[in-house]
């Protein structure tokens, strides 16, 4: 059976492609004909294509685990002596496997969306699935035609070429899946926005759904970027955590637009303002997620992460990016309506601060985008070769970063009557992140020198003593490991063990840094080439605060896990808001008020009530506004009007009738 497994995997890819081509047809037909059965068939199609992709990915993973070197992709990226963890990481260690992983995770997001809303009849949901299915079909077409991971080689290779040594690190087991998980969640949010355009309206309820899927996608992308930064710090031996590499920037760009999107959606879902901001940022996030794939997979930009330049793949990748981007922008231009109510902002209102945040994020995004692509544009224009590195990005983005910190402080302390715990957690993470950057940059000290066993050097008050060199042989490599003792005022506080590894299969040498840390300080050692008899080159670093950078990132992610509460400085206002919310009905629920329901529209309306209470509006004004917008149905207590006179008069009439009956009975006696 194992003989035909790769063919089974490829067949599953073909079937999934076919399902994704047919699924949008059922969605559009169901919406147009208002046929619920066709809409449910759309959900079934999404679940079926996910099952097929899961089968294909499972087959590829099994081929790696059993070292099936008859598959070219396995032979190029695996080795029989690799541990099973590294064999698993090798599945997405090359172009074909990583692209299949991305498609699988996007498919998983789509299946989760389909399952979650399988009972809904609103056209928004099948239209969202149709948009997702179209993107999956386009990506699968590229996989089948230009990136098939199941291509055979005959006769089979005797041994594999091994996984790239740079990728043989725990961080790389989780870094790519988290990035692709983030891209997938953000693409679902963008698909909701595009589906709302197809439906004809992007309102607060749509924004709430969009926000609900963008937030976990943003969290996964943030975690992936943090993990990638940690990998670069631990693996590349430069003592830094961010190098403004084109592929690093490729993941930063959608993160910037997604962060701006979340801020914009926070107002759209509550007050239905900034609609165009939210729609455009959702589309831009989709485009930048695709652009990142184009940069990494085509090799058009020089990077330590990118794959080799491949014109055969670059052209269809660019065509795919252009097709989806232009179609999304064209849909926005065709279907976008007015931007909602006209609202005037005061000088330091929440709305004005969020607008400033959006402008700052867009400015940084534009700087990073132009700086990343400019060397390629420079070369295409025939002007020669140009390098745009860290000095440019640091100087160009610094003033905008400082302004962001000012806005965060203002948003935290000048927001007035309401304070949201998730925002406080996220902004605390940003401040800790900024503190880590400043402290690590100011405190960093380094030295490069040659040492023999027994020699020592003092740096930043700490003594590094090269004690001995150990030789080791492990699975797929041999290594020379230096034992460097670390002293603080003559007291031994630990050891550093930098290595030089040689990977036989690839005939490649790698330097493995060694790091010791205590929460505040980092001690970092890299062993270089042999420069004489028992003499080796070393680079040593001491710096503080670098862990705060990743801690700040984790706090930002924790923001997504905090219960979305709303606290008021005035307890009376909080009680008033809860009282009003309890009097309003969720329009889509079975007899639940806004406090009892967690439906997207109910949460959006609840936040609207809280916002209006915080602005000083009274109960009559808020209930009147809700009634005008949603109709009398939204009120648990129907208003006293001519149409409801019978309803309200009935209890009074019955009481009078009962009193009359009792009086007559008593009179007869």
Residue ranges and their predicted role:
Residues 610-668:
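Thiol/selenol-based redox catalytic cores and closely related redox-interacting motifs
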